[in-house]
Amino acid sequence: MWHTEWQDSKDIMMEHNNVILRVIDPANIDTVSALLLDQARVSLTEPGCERFEVYHSRSDAQTFLLIESWATAEDLDAHRNNKNFVEIYKPKVLPLVERIPHPSERLI
């Protein structure tokens, strides 16, 4: 794995999960936005959540980007079993979007 000398070894071991979400019906953009903001607020309180950011594209209103960093793979798995993820994200967000996950390795 390539990394810079100054990069914290803790960061190398983290789970970085970046997700592109494309809203299928433009009429649902505001709904998806509100649900993602709620998901982010809850996720940031979960054990192991180091970063959970939600971006809304300026060039394509139907596109959102989630940038997540978790201390361990176990923390990410626990997040995916969290009540908010199971009761809000999966049933209310996922049916409204096309989801492209990008588990990532941070280079710098």
What residue ranges belong to the model's regions?
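Short, conserved structural micro-motifs that define repeat-unit consensus positions
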Residues: Q39, G48-E53
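Short, well-ordered beta-strand segments in beta-rich or mixed alpha/beta enzyme
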Residues: E15-V23, E53-R80
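Glycine-rich beta-strand-turn "strand-cap" elements at beta-sheet edges
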Residues: W2-K10, L21, V54-D60, I88-I108
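A generic beta-sheet turn/junction motif
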Residues: L36, P47, R58-S59
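An amphipathic, aromatic/His-enriched active-site/gating alpha helix that lines ligand/cofactor pockets
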Residues: L44-P47, S69-H102
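N-terminal first-folded block
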Residues: E15-L44
